[in-house]
Swiss-Prot record:
It comes from Welwitschia mirabilis. Its main location: plastid. This is Photosystem II reaction center protein H. InterPro entries: PSII_PsbH, PSII_PsbH_sf. The modification Phosphothreonine is found at residues 3, 5.
Amino acid sequence: MATQTVNETSRTRPRRTGIGSYLKPLNSEYGKVAPGWGTTPLMGFFMVLFAIFLSLLLEIYNSSILLNGISVSW
C-alpha cells in the first residue's frame, strides 16, 4: 500500500486564543461574494488617481514639470 494512515491520537486540535476568537467574525464572510460590481468602480477611480500621482512624481524627477522657487539638484 502506497499510503500510510496516521494515528488519530497524534493530531492536536488548534489552540483557541483570545485574539482568534475576536477576529473570527471578520473571517466568517470568507468565500462569499456579493452580487454585482460592488466597489470595483471606486477601486478603478483610485487606481487612476494613483497612476496620475506616479506620473507627476516621474515628471518632477525628470524636470518635465518646473516648480518655481524650488531648486532640484540630484
